Amino acid sequence: MLIIPAIDIKDGKCVRLTRGEFDKKKIYLDNPRDMAIIWRKQNAKMIHIVDLDAALTGKLVNFEKIREIVTDLDIPVQVGGGLRSVDAVEKYLDIGVSRVVIGSAAVTNPGLVEDLLKRYSPSQIVVGIDAENGIPKIKGWTESSGMQDYELALQMKKLGVKRIIYTDIACDGMMQGVGFESTKRFVEKAGMRVTASGGVTGSEDLRKLQTLEKYGVDSVIIGKALYENNFSCQKLWYNFEKCIGIDCDFSTALKKECCS
């Protein structure tokens, strides 16, 4: 199963939210590029980036920050947040982003997904479904849609979408365990390749998700658990790595572990 570290960007900084609530954000680093390098040094094979400002406004607020990451990394980068037009998607793919995630627009403008799949490979266009109690939420999780999560997935499947990124909002950022039952229910009904997201706390959650591989879950996006060093391999890495190999001018507790 592929482990994909997440980088959420708000006001140009690397942050994590709790259940998508913007008033419950924690800043981890001032420069998201530095965070991307940390994850790459910990052997990440792909990075997942969300422009939270764009998710709210529909404008690519943090485009230049994301460009820096794509330029400096040697691994695929997937980007989501506020991608509501062909031009926005094209702008990211043109700078080397490997995969874009269509969220709100899949609900409000499914024709956009259809148009994108005429221009690009299904490996480049995926749909993100962020659900609360089985109902997809849109526009930075501030509004609910009028359908079930699996119904949206099946609609996207008919358009040619091959992969869904599925987030259980109730678990996201809570550090209380992955939404296993909700994810299992979704993948059984959707019958698609799925990247799970939201709530992974440690190795036990990964073992549980592995049991869903037979249904199509082949990867997982992890956020806060990685930032809080919940995996023993991270602790070993920080103990033996003297410097992170960047400017070491961090604004969080990571400075001590990385640069002492």
Curated annotation (Swiss-Prot):
Gene3D superfamilies in alphabetical order: Aldolase class I
GO BP terms in the entry: L-histidine biosynthetic process; L-tryptophan biosynthetic process
Subcellular location per the Swiss-Prot or TrEMBL entry: Cytoplasm
Top-tier EC class: isomerase
Record field: catalytic activity: 1-(5-phospho-beta-D-ribosyl)-5-[(5-phospho-beta-D-ribosylamino)methylideneamino]imidazole-4-carboxamide = 5-[(5-phospho-1-deoxy-D-ribulos-1-ylimino)methylamino]-1-(5-phospho-beta-D-ribosyl)imidazole-4-carboxamide
Record carries keyword Isomerase: yes
Protein family: Belongs to the HisA/HisF family.
Name of this chain's protein: 1-(5-phosphoribosyl)-5-[(5-phosphoribosylamino)methylideneamino] imidazole-4-carboxamide isomerase
